[in-house]
Each structure stands twice: as C-alpha cells, then as structure tokens.
C-alpha cells in the first residue's frame, strides 16, 4: 500500500506531544475506534524496543499487527516497524513527525504504509485499504488533539502479570 499521511495541529508543546505519542500504552486512548485487543508485548512501553500487538478491525480484512519502536529522535520523530496479516508476512511501517509551530503549537504528521508481497494480501489492499486507513488515522489524530488539549488523564494499557514489587538482581540478594 502506498503511504497514507494524516496531519493535525495540536495546541501543546512538542515535548508533551512527543512523550504521549512515544508511549505505546497511550495508543488505545485515541485509536480504539479502529484498533481492538491492544496488548503490550514488553513491560517498558516507551523507548526503542517497546512493542505492542493489536487487531485492526477492518471489515474486509481484519488482521493482527505487531509494532515495535525502532527509532526515536526526541522530540522530533518516532519510527515504528512491524509485521501484520496472516503469519505476519506483511511489513508495516509508521512514522510520527512533530514540528514546532508558532504559539507553542505542534504539527503532528503521521505516515503509515504496508508492503504486502503475497498476491492475496495485495488484492485485499486494493479493496479500499488506503482510503480506510487514511480516514481512521485522520480521526485518530483529531482524537489525539482533543485528548492532549483537554489535558484529561487517559487509561493506560498495563502488562498483565507485571510484578508489582520490584525484584532485586541476583547479585544484590543475599
């Protein structure tokens, strides 16, 4: 699928927007209208290597996608890579770019694309996937804008079974 780009201008400092976007545990707060069953795959939900798995609820082609934060350039860019579809055979890419605008506003630009190699996957994408993703990501950025500008707290995704009591490394234990 060719890249899909969505943009929004948010009335918040770039550092605040970056911190929110770079934390995968916050994603369901503004993407739950098209993404379901969101699971963190690693306990730290921020930083390079943080990962999540979720289901894209597209009627014509529901699929699971795994995304991993591949590169961070605070507070400018978050680059994610992943795989999705049947047997995780479709490479998936997401790039968040944040630019400072006058008056402490931030322009958020999100680019999303997939690289299907299997003929069945390419055929499914011809059934309106690009338009569908563009509309969903545009709405997600509007919801992100509303959430950040309102300053209301969001329900973060937690890792099931995470140890609530920090454990000490074996070298420190006696």
What is the predicted role of each segment?
Residues 1-44, 163-174:
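Hydrophobic ligand-binding cavity/cleft-lining segments
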Residues 1-9, 15, 51, 64, ...:
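Intrinsic-disorder/low-complexity, polar/charged segments enriched in Ser/Thr/Lys/Arg/Asp/Glu/Gln
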Residues 6-8, 39-40, 56, 64-71, ...:
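Hydrophobic/aromatic beta-strand elements that line small-molecule binding cavities or substrate pockets
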Residues 14-15, 43-46, 70-76, 97-107:
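A short, structured loop/turn motif at beta-sheet edges
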Residues 17-21, 27, 52-54, 69, ...:
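Hydrophobic pocket/interface hotspot
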Residues 46, 59-61, 86-90:
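Short glycine/serine/proline-enriched coil/turn segments at secondary-structure junctions
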Residues 81-139, 146, 155-157:
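Beta-strand/loop substructures that line and gate deep hydrophobic ligand-binding cavities in soluble
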Residues 153-165:
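Short, flexible loop/turn segments with low-complexity composition
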């Amino acid at each position: 699928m060719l890249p899909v780009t969505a943009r929004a201008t948010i009335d918040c400092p770039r550092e605040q927007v970056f911190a929110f976007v770079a934390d995968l545990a916050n994603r369901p707060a503004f993407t739950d209208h098209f993404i379901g069953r969101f699971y963190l795959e690693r306990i730290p939900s921020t930083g390079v290597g943080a990962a999540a798995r979720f289901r894209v609820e597209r009627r014509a082609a529901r699929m699971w996608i795994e995304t991993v934060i591949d590169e961070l350039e605070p507070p400018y860019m978050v680059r994610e890579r992943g795989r999705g579809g049947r047997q995780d055979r479709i490479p998936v890419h997401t790039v968040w770019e944040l630019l400072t605008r006058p008056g402490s506003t931030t322009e958020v630009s999100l680019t999303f694309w997939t690289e299907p190699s299997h003929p069945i996957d390419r055929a499914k994408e011809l059934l309106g996937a690009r338009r569908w993703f563009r509309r969903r990501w545009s709405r997600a950025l509007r919801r992100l804008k509303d959430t950040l500008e309102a300053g209301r707290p969001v329900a973060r995704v937690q890792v099931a079974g995470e140890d609530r009591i920090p454990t000490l490394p074996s070298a420190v234990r006696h």
